[in-house]
Regions:
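Short acidic/histidine-rich motifs immediately flanking catalytic phosphotransfer sites
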Residues: 12-18, 35-40
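Beta-loop-alpha module in the N-terminal Rossmann-like domain of NAD(P)-dependent dehydrogenases
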Residues: 17-33, 47-49
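Rossmann-fold NAD(P)-binding glycine/threonine-rich loop
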Residues: 43-66
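Alpha-helical segments flanking ligand/cofactor-binding loops in enzyme cores
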Residues: 10, 29-32, 55
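Conserved Rossmann-fold cofactor-binding substructure of NAD(P)-dependent oxidoreductases
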Residues: 2-14, 26
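Oxidoreductase and adenylate-handling cofactor-binding alpha/beta cores
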Residues: 73-91
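Active-site-lining helix/loop region of Rossmann-like oxidoreductase modules
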Residues: 86-143
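Short, acidic/turn-prone active-site loops that include or flank metal/cofactor-
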Residues: 3, 24, 44-50, 69-71
Length: 143
């Protein structure tokens, strides 16, 4: 299914919440389409200002949970839900891109969109410093 050109939301009528897992460059428009009919949890980063989607969500009586992430993020939400429904002694959440069997040249397995993995290290970052949100060059203060 090509979500850019097909009315994918029609296939999801029986759902209450949709988890948007598309690459970041598609996230804003996909969340916009979802919010017209459903509540959306977006696990990816989107370069656009997701606050611009508030009007759509309010008019449709839906909600957006942006930039929720995978782990920490969606995995923790799922575990939290499980804990409310049953007794659990131990949970292991294992998410990552470091494979047991490494394959050159990268020795890495992208757990999500390779474009987004690269962008995590190349796009400007937002940080909170002394209570003020700043946009800085990638890896500022780390290397």
């Amino acid at each position: 299914m090509d979500i850019r050109n097909e009315p994918f939301i029609d296939y999801l009528e029986d759902t209450e919440i949709i988890i948007n897992c598309v690459p970041g460059f598609m996230g804003f428009e996909t969340s916009k389409k979802i919010l017209e009919k459903k509540t959306c949890v977006d696990i990816s980063f989107m370069p656009e200002d997701c606050n611009e989607l508030n009007t759509i969500a309010k008019e449709a009586e839906t909600a957006l949970y942006p930039d929720a992430g995978v782990a920490p993020g969606l995995s923790n939400i799922i575990v939290g839900n499980l804990i409310t429904k049953q007794e659990i002694d131990e949970i292991k959440i294992m998410v990552g891109g470091l494979p047991i069997e490494k394959k050159p040249p990268w020795n890495y397995k992208a757990p999500f969109s390779p474009i987004d993995v690269i962008e995590e290290y190349t796009r400007p970052a937002r940080i909170k410093k002394n209570g003020i949100i700043e946009t800085v060059k990638p890896l500022t203060g780390l290397i």
